[in-house]
Amino acid sequence: MNETKPVRTEGTSLPRAGHDEGQMRGRVLVTGANGQLGRALMTLLPQAGFEPTGVDLPEVDISDAAAMSSWDWTGYDVIINAAAWTNVDGAETPEGRRLSWRANTVGPVNLARAAVQHGLTLVHLSTEYTFDGATALHTEEETPSPLGVYGQSKAAGDAAVSVCPQHYLVRTSWVVGDGKNFVKTMLSLAERGISPRVVADQTGRLTFASDLAAGIIHLITSGAEFGTYNLSGDGPILSWADIAKRVYEKAGHSPDEVTPVTTEEYYAGQEGIAPRPLSSVLDLARIKATGFSPADSTERLNVYLQDLL
């Protein structure tokens, strides 16, 4: 049985919200603030009593060592790195490979250096793409085995962050939030009367950005031990095709309009496609042991669709 206790030392919790009316809990730098998770963090952090500063490209490039070295870290308590190059297929191209390694490895190296030098807590977002997907359930102790450039660059960035004494490496998967995402794409197809072919042999659970942000805030305020945590939605394990069928049904269409296919069938004849892990299911025992209860992803999907329809 896998050990559920993180290997790092106990974290130092920031003041709990509400223990002194009006007291701020700390200043947080959020990188990748314009992304799905970044937007959720910028909304929820102030509600939890934090003062967040959000940065993103092109104004701030975390892979620029000189810029990060000259950044005024005075007064910051936490860095949350939600910045990443996430174009999985694009990372397989010569230019994409360079951009992926720059954002996903060099950037975290620079942030880890700053965190160590200034005594900050670094929260870094990772992905199930650091695994090959051959294991049905991924624990925090699983050895990285990335299949493509994106996963390789993320695994290297994770390694850099892991040497930071005060770090939370948060591994997640299948994120849904503000902006373009799989659920919105399927809903658009349903509304236009399109019957899609959707991959059925890749399995996992959706993670809603607001729930992911809430889990991160829990880690930095609860005194949870530093180290690696899996954090995704909970509930039934589904395929992309299963989720698409649920979207079609909620939109008033027949789920039979969605045709399940294998990954190999879906990408047949296409070039430059990155390999995907077939299992994206994360073991959530460790994050639950800290007192955080991940939301049921199917229930959250229903609520999300109600808001969209």
Q: Would you name each region that the model predicts?
A:
Residues R16, P275-L309:
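C-terminal amphipathic/interface module of NAD(P)-dependent oxidoreductases
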Residues G26-L44:
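N-terminal Rossmann NAD(P)H-binding glycine-rich loop of SDR-like oxidoreductase domains
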Residues T31, V55, I79-A83, L122-E128, ...:
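SDR active-site strand-loop-helix element
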Residues G54, A65-T105:
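NAD(P)H-binding glycine-rich loop region in Rossmannoid oxidoreductase-like domains
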Residues R98-R102, V106-N110, Q117, T130-V170, ...:
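Catalytic helix-loop patch of NAD(P)-dependent Rossmann-fold dehydrogenases
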Residues S162-G204, S210-D211:
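NAD(P)-dependent short-chain dehydrogenase/reductase
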Residues L187-S195, L206-D234:
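Alpha-helical substrate-binding/gating segment
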Residues G215, S222-G272:
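Mid/C-terminal beta-alpha module of Rossmann-like enzyme folds, strongest
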